[in-house]
Amino acid sequence: MTSGGSTRADVGIEGGRIVAIGDAGSASRDLDAAGLLVLPGCVDLHTHLASTPTFTPLDDFEHGTRAAIAGGVTTVCSMVYQEGTLRAGIERGLRDAERSLADFAFHVVVTDPTDAAVTELPSLARDGHTGLKVFMVTPRFGDRITDYVRLLRAAAAAGMLTAVHAEDHETVARATTLLHAAGHDAVRYFPESRPAAAEDIAIRAAAELAAKTGAAMYFVHLSSRVALAALAEAKSRGLHVYGETRPLYLYLTRERFERPDAALWVGQPPLREREDVEAIWNALRGGLLDTVGTDHYPHLRAAKLAPDLAFDRVPPGVANLETLLPMLYSEGVRRGRLTVERVVDVLATSPARIAGLRSKGEIAVGKDADIVIFDPEHTRTIRVGEMHSACDYDPFEGWEVTGWPMITLLRGEVVYADGEILAQPGQGRLVARDPSQGARS
């Protein structure tokens, strides 16, 4: 399967790359995929597997990529955080990723857009690093907008992608203050603290910055109808912008926040209305949205459900890597919302193209042999005890899914088969961005 169609053929692999598609002839080893789908390994451009000086994620590179390869995700892009210099953040990420079971790349979160940070970008681009990330939801972004404009111009000149967390700080801060003043501290008020208007305002402001600076922007975790409308307007202007949604917004609504365990679904932005869910499916089907990224960042159940936490103190994030592909196939293809080709596009081909990861995302001669042998008829119920994340709950616990990865190959090596992790920590490699591809492709 490719994003352009399907064919019945052998796939020949040698030296970790695809060398033939068709009649591959004799081989030293055969994998029988008769009756199954042969898909390219998924590329997730949005994970949080790297540590910071003060925090180590529950799913680090080892645990997170165990879940990834079990779910057919062979390349992960993790956020790393500036530590004085941007390169110091990348170096920490490289140390963390020494135990990765999947291939990996980084986005550097820029928290202090100094002149020195700006001057680092050309060398980072030459070294093949994919891009940056900025958080519009922090007060720092507005306070230092002149510095961020300079950063965006430099990123554009270097051909780097800028991932954007697009929620307007003032809108979120005002809503949060009003809720606390009214004594509405409970987690069920979380959706009201981050209204969809915050996305709308931020995306439109970011689009103006993209027009001003020439920056290529990748809007992460879009959750609402108004966010989609703002993205559509930016694209209609010919700006270099891309849109990502995440699994939570495809399957769940804010009704989860009426439950006693509402905190388990706290993520930023929050879950929205049923109309938003349907709009996101339409945007994914029609091509307005380019990718689905997990924003994988789980926390233990006890940490999420601590009784003394107000809505804005609950640690945000959930586990999604292992269920990314099977959920999208089951809820998308099986329900007639998406074609298999479109699933391949949004989970593999487009993410690789957008990030400039030339060797990834396609089953084609010359590409890395990152392959998922997928059984479209295999039905299973999601149970946390069967998942490979270190998290002790799953946001889709009890969900019946039809379609599941049976075998995952990373650069031609079988790293997962029939429920067993076969890869070793450290098997993953850094994937360099191709300077001729990526942000403006």
Locate predicted features.
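Divalent metal-coordination and catalytic microenvironments
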Residues: 11, 16, 35, 46, ...
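A glycine-rich helix N-cap at a beta->alpha junction
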Residues: 95-110
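N-terminal metal-binding scaffold of metallo-dependent hydrolase/deaminase domains
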Residues: 1-26
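His/Asp/Glu-enriched, well-ordered alpha-helical/loop segment
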Residues: 186-216, 264, 286, 290-292, ...
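Short, surface-exposed connector motifs at secondary-structure boundaries
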Residues: 72-77, 101-105, 131, 209-217, ...
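Histidine/acidic residue-rich metal-binding segments in metalloenzymes
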Residues: 116-136, 140-292, 309
